[in-house]
């Protein structure tokens, strides 16, 4: 009888071990599909499915509490053993509590909050409130004296050397920016590198030298793992400009060989001030304005500069329909200073901070209230006389075409044939002051209907004759009569084939 009872024990032990193994496997993210509570998934009965973890958070500010429940994909669990997304965080004025779990609907819970009503101020607290500002003023004065004494006013934190350990967990050794961009364009969403990768790159860049200043900030040449990059640094006052430009650059399917290659955006806070960074490809020739000031160009060089500019603008203006589509974009500040010259003699369009996107589904334009923006010298007639139709997206594209015609004029003047060329000049240099007002430009362009002078010598060269014809058709007072960027691109492509030019 005892032998009969003892016989099943090994079988029972095996069943227990199997159950334990199954339970352990269930704890690993990605082991099986999880069903999680999702407060935004109204069409799916507030349920989402993931191969990672369920997530719930509560963010507390001084005046409200925000609850968030959703799925976290396994690919976003970085690092895998202690994901950043599952860690609590705190910022000035807010505290976020998070919880990650791996059971079906395990995130359908209410996390405890810590915000409590503050009691009335007692004598000690009242004294602290009064003494606090006084102490702050004293400390500030002492700090100013210290800074003046040492004569060191630091505007940018420039590390002496890179610390590769900072990016090792996320970006493997030997990985280049070209590798990261290629991976992003072939397997990603097409809207830019993941934010964590962008931040990792930005925080391991070594600034080398300041190479220019613009309307919203300063541009530096920097290095990341030996590769040169351009870093546009905005002050904290220009946060909206920084955010807008980063947002436009990360538009799905925007990447193009004739649009400046965006790499990363990051905000760097050292406790005293905040710097807002935009990291992009570095082009040693600088802007087209600088390039034309320094060099003349051949017929081939002129066609390359013009065709690549037209190709970039045509890509901006084009809407790509589909799940990985791209909205049509108008630049609104096209000029030679916002076009960069690449090492191979072609151009890429930069400075998209004033650009607007068109949503064809709703026929709306995301535009700031102030529509008279950009550089006055390059403003189209309809912008100068305030007759532009702000609700019609084609109006903005036509204004870009007018500006590109002026850029082509700048390029063609520097085309040297038989040693003959014109000095570099800005459009309307002989008609308006160096910094013209809107009224001065309106008088010349709209009332007198003047346009930049086209030299007679251009008629003796087929390439310059074609360029002159394109310019005139870009400068029509009636925007609807102007050429499109795609038409200009095709005309210049035919010209390059006739001249035997390989792009």
Curated annotation (Swiss-Prot):
Signal peptide (UniProt feature, chain positions): 1-33
Cytoplasmic side of membrane: 148-503
Catalytic activities: L-threonyl-[receptor-protein] + ATP = O-phospho-L-threonyl-[receptor-protein] + ADP + H(+); L-seryl-[receptor-protein] + ATP = O-phospho-L-seryl-[receptor-protein] + ADP + H(+)
Residues found modified as Phosphoserine: 165, 187, 189, 191
Disulfide bridges in this chain: 36-54, 38-41, 48-71, 86-100, 101-106
GS domain residues: 175-204
Necessary cofactors: Mg(2+); Mn(2+)
Effect of residue 45 to S: In MSSE; hypomorphic variant
Glycyl lysine isopeptide (Lys-Gly) (interchain with G-Cter in ubiquitin) crosslink location in chain: 268
GO BP terms, alphabetized: activin receptor signaling pathway; angiogenesis involved in coronary vascular morphogenesis; anterior/posterior pattern specification; apoptotic process; artery morphogenesis; blastocyst development; cardiac epithelial to mesenchymal transition; cell motility
Membrane topology according to the record: Single-pass type I membrane protein
Motif annotated as FKBP1A-binding, chain positions: 193-194
Gene3D superfamilies: CD59 (2.10.60.10), Phosphorylase Kinase, domain 1 (3.30.200.20), Transferase(Phosphotransferase) domain 1 (1.10.510.10)
Modification after translation: Phosphorylated at basal levels in the absence of ligand. Activated upon phosphorylation by TGFBR2, mainly in the GS domain. Phosphorylation in the GS domain abrogates FKBP1A-binding.
Effect of residue 204 to D: Constitutive activation
Keyword terms of this UniProt record: Aortic aneurysm, Apoptosis, ATP-binding, Cell junction, Cell membrane, Craniosynostosis, Differentiation, Disease variant, Disulfide bond, Glycoprotein, Growth regulation, Isopeptide bond, Kinase, Magnesium, Manganese, Membrane, Metal-binding, Nucleotide-binding, Phosphoprotein, Receptor, Serine/threonine-protein kinase, Signal, Tight junction, Transferase, Transmembrane, Transmembrane helix, Ubl conjugation
E.C. number: 2.7.11.30
Documented activity regulation: Kept in an inactive conformation by FKBP1A preventing receptor activation in absence of ligand. CD109 is another inhibitor of the receptor.
Residue numbers of Phosphothreonine PTMs: 185-186
Covalent cross-link site, Glycyl lysine isopeptide (Lys-Gly) (interchain with G-Cter in SUMO): 391
Topological domain ranges for the Extracellular compartment: 34-126
Effect of residue 267 to H: In a patient with Marfan syndrome
Family in the record: Belongs to the protein kinase superfamily. TKL Ser/Thr protein kinase family. TGFB receptor subfamily.
Illness: Loeys-Dietz syndrome 1: An aortic aneurysm syndrome with widespread systemic involvement, characterized by arterial tortuosity and aneurysms, hypertelorism, and bifid uvula or cleft palate. Physical findings include prominent joint laxity, easy bruising, wide and atrophic scars, velvety and translucent skin with easily visible veins, spontaneous rupture of the spleen or bowel, and catastrophic complications of pregnancy, including rupture of the gravid uterus and the arteries, either during pregnancy or in the immediate postpartum period. Multiple self-healing squamous epithelioma: A disorder characterized by multiple skin tumors that undergo spontaneous regression. Tumors appear most often on sun-exposed regions, are locally invasive, and undergo spontaneous resolution over a period of months leaving pitted scars.
Protein name: TGF-beta receptor type-1
Underlying gene: TGFBR1
